Amino acid sequence: MNKTYYVCKYTPIELLEAFGGECQNLNEMPQGFDHADQIAHPNICGFGKALLEAVMSGKVKELVLVNCCDTIRSVYDILEDSGKLDFLYMIDVLHCDAECSRERTAVQLKGLAKAYGEYKGTTFDEEKFRQAFKKPEHIVKPHISVLGARMGNELFDMVQKSMPYPVENDTCVNNRSVGEAEPPKDLEFDELMAWYAKELLGQIPCMRMMDHSGRKRLYNDPGLKGIIYHT
């Protein structure tokens, strides 16, 4: 069974797992961009090229994106045109947590559920949905935090080996905080998606969100001994 890859903390992983999906964060850097350089503008960022390379090399067959930046929009257009993926979907999330944004996100979730369910040939399993919610684990003892731009697994491994304290990757998708609350019971699907949209948008905000004051949680930590800011 193919894994469904994602790159954004606002990806509804729990919903995908409710339809039988196995999700994995795509966060590796390739050895080069031989494939990506043939199909994308040379000015596209390294992360965008890494996504293209992973797909064009055949590693990724299922990918769910969120429109977090112009690069992702460009990557989506290129991949849609390439026809290399068995399943490709992009969720359009507004950069705020207002009521209208929650309503729009709920609509997007239902659209994804329909498309993914048809692709998988499965229906929504509420029990699997509930089981997919897991409380985030954080380092509570003295540690160092990596903040800022997304840091790939390879570079993070190097940082871990060179620091005197345990290191927590708090960049981008790695500070996903869905799972701090369990889904309420006895809700219809539409009501459940409305609740879920609120949970997704209520996470520690991405740097691209209009109100990112909630990111203070990342450094107002009594166990934090230092910060590495990745640019």
Task: Give the predicted meaning of each segment.
Residues 1-231:
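An N-terminal assembly and electron-transfer interface module characteristic of large anaerobic redox
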